[in-house]
Structures are given as C-alpha cells and as structure tokens.
Amino acid sequence: MPSQKIISALAEIESSASPQNKLQLYNDLLSETVSASPEPQLADDLIYYLDSVLSEDLSIVAARPILDSFIYTLRKLSSETQIKVAQHAVNLLQSRSASVEEQDAQIREILADAYEAEEEYIAAARALQGIHIDSSQRLVSDSAKVKLWIRIVRLYLEEDDTTSAEAFLNRIKNLPSKIEDHELKLHFRLSQARIQDARRRFLDASQEYFAVSLAAGVDESDRLQALAAAIRCAVLAPAGPQRSRTLATLYKDDRATSVEEFGILEKMFLDRLLTPEEVSAFAQRLAPHQLAQTADGTTVLDKAVVEHNLVAASKLYENIKTDALGAILGLQASGDLTAGEKAEAYAARMVEQGRLSGSIDQIDGIIYFESNTTATGRHIRQWDAGVQGLSEGVERVATNIAEGHLVR
C-alpha cells in the first residue's frame, strides 16, 4: 500500500494546471521518494507513482521523458524492488506500448536482469520475449535481434528447457544475414551443441563442442571443458564409420591427453574392449539427461558401450558363438531373451544399418565378422589419424586466414 505522503504529493501534481511544471514536479518527487522511502515501502510507492504517470490524464508525449527518468532510477534499485515495479510497469505499458516501445524494451531488460539475479531464468526469458522487434516505431538490426535471442536461448538452457531454446535458435538460423560478431557466433555454437546434446544428437553435438574448443578468444579452461564435452558426446554416439571419424579427430588433438575422458577415448578409437569399471567411472562424469533410461530400460551409455564392444570383438574374432559374444558384452538374460539372443539382435541391427560388417548364422548361433582390420593394424590407424590431423590442421589454418581471424 502506498504511503500517505506520496498519495498527497501526486494528488497535488495531478491538480496542477500547468503541464510544463508537471515534468519537474514528477522528477523531484521521484528523487525524494527513492531517497526517503524505506525498502519495503519503496516498491508500493513507485507503483503508485507509475499509475499516475501512465494515467489517461497525462499524454504519452508528456509521460515519455518522465518514464526515461524513472528507468534511470529503476536501474539503481535492488533486484527485489525492480521485479515488483518493473513487472507492474510492463503490464501498464501493454495498452500503450506502440508509443513507448523503447521505454518498454528498457524496462523489460531491467526486469530480465533482476529475474536472472534471483536465478528465475524462465521468468527472465519471458520478460525479454515481450520486447517488440518487428515494428515501424522501433527499428531493430539483425545483430541486435541475434543478441536478444541468444540471451533468451541461454536463459532457457539454464532450466534445461531445450524446446523453447531451440525455437529461438531457429529464429537466428532463419535470419537472412549471417552472424558477424565473434562472441555471438561462439554463444550460438555452444547453445546449439547443448540443445543437440540434450536431444541425443550426440555426433552433431560433439562436432559443435569441438568447434567451440578451437575458437579464438576462449579461455583455456573453457576450451578444455568444451573438448571434454565433445569426447563425452562422441562416446555416447552410435557406433559406426561416422563416429569412428569423429573419435579419430578428437584422439589426434594434442590437448586430448589433458582431460579425464582421454582413457575411454583412446580405448574406443583403438577398438579395445571396455571394462565395467571403466564405464562406471566414465558414467560419473555424465549429465543427468545423458544417463536417462530409454524405452527398453537401458541408458544411452549402456547401448553405446555394448555397440562399441561388439565392434571391438569383431576386430579380435573372425567368428564367435552368440552366447559367448553375449558374455563378452556383459549382457544378461531377461524375459524370453537369452544373453546370446540379445547379442544377436544388437549385431543384426548394426549389420542392417551398415555399422558392422558381417553375417549371422541363426541356426548354428554363430556371427561371422568381415574385417580387414585386425588388432595388429592399430598402429596403421594411429598413423592414418596423424595424417588426417595434419590435413585438417592445414585446412583450419587456411579457413582462419580466409575469415580474417588470428591463427592460434
């Protein structure tokens, strides 16, 4: 409830016959209210003050400079007071926003800052969503739109709301102009990686994280975090030629040995069998969404490890009984399926999808692998990875020069 003092002061200003005097009187009262009202009372007094400024008795032309002074003052207040007052302000401005779009945008930005300070990220994002960007009254450049939408995306991602985040990321993709600002481009790629990661598009996410880890102007510790995220996503991706290429790119990066994920990366790249202990240690570094169960009751990690170990087994054996393969893969019988039948199902799906070369004799329960790569060929693959790394490095240098970036 507003104080009696501000009620009386505003009544006196509203009854003043001279519009020229009102601007100064409103500004003087605002300064006096902020300096004299105690914190718990201040929000109520400012809300009552706003009601007077935005009443029908005062034209919007006269109200605009008063609003500008009010916004300047609002920036200096506590986040709690800002939320109460700014939320009331944007509600009042909805009916008159066409005439005060710039002031409405500034108040919404203050409101978003306050919500973010209180870790209310969804509320902050929604406050920013209300900013008018396609209007004849207020011209907004594509660069400013990108900056606004990137912030909204990041706020939604703070609460793992990937659906809302992706909707605004798609708006950026649909802009006719490219993102020129390096920092905005970096935030875009990182946001895209996080969304793809959450949607379990792990190969795409790995590539985006890796690109961020190579970007100029990023702190070294953040680069390594992005590289570690790229490795985790590559490990979780379905086994196959595309993942093998991604693993090779990550493995030949000189920085890979600096992150904890290097051990599992090396074993996967060299097609070595993973032990349950190694998988358990790796699982502790995964995010909750990366450990969520799928429809069949397994996790993405469980499936990725089984498929990897199946590929690793194909490098060790020319053929193997399905029951023996089930034991190697650590599969357990459940329901009507034996461990061998589960192993056969995994192998059949991978062969059908072209991610494993081989054939299955269902009558004898034997899987025949077709592979020209044996365990002794690992050094050749390491050599190939080195050559590939050199080629990609040269290409990256050429790209950086073409884009005008410093070569790091």
UniProtKB/Swiss-Prot annotation:
Compartment(s) of residence: Cytoplasm; Nucleus
Gene Ontology CC: COP9 signalosome; cytoplasm
PROSITE patterns found in the cross-reference section: PCI
Residues of the PCI domain: 194-374
UniProt cross-references to Pfam families, sorted A to Z: PCI, PSMD12-CSN4_N
Coiled coil feature spans: none
Presence of keyword Nucleus: yes
Keyword terms: Cytoplasm, Nucleus, Signalosome
Gene3D superfamilies, A to Z: Winged helix-like DNA-binding domain superfamily/Winged helix DNA-binding domain
InterPro entries referenced in this protein's UniProt entry, alphabetically: PCI_dom, PSMD12-CSN4-like_N, PSMD12/CSN4, WH-like_DNA-bd_sf, WH_DNA-bd_sf
Its job: Component of the COP9 signalosome (CSN) complex that acts as an regulator of the ubiquitin (Ubl) conjugation pathway by mediating the deneddylation of the cullin subunit of SCF-type E3 ubiquitin-protein ligase complexes. The CSN complex seems to link protein degradation to sexual development. Required for fruit body formation.
Protein family (similarity comment): Belongs to the CSN4 family.
Assembly description: Component of the COP9 signalosome (CSN) complex.
Protein name in the entry: COP9 signalosome complex subunit 4
Protein source organism: Emericella nidulans (strain FGSC A4 / ATCC 38163 / CBS 112.46 / NRRL 194 / M139) (Aspergillus nidulans)
Gene: csnD
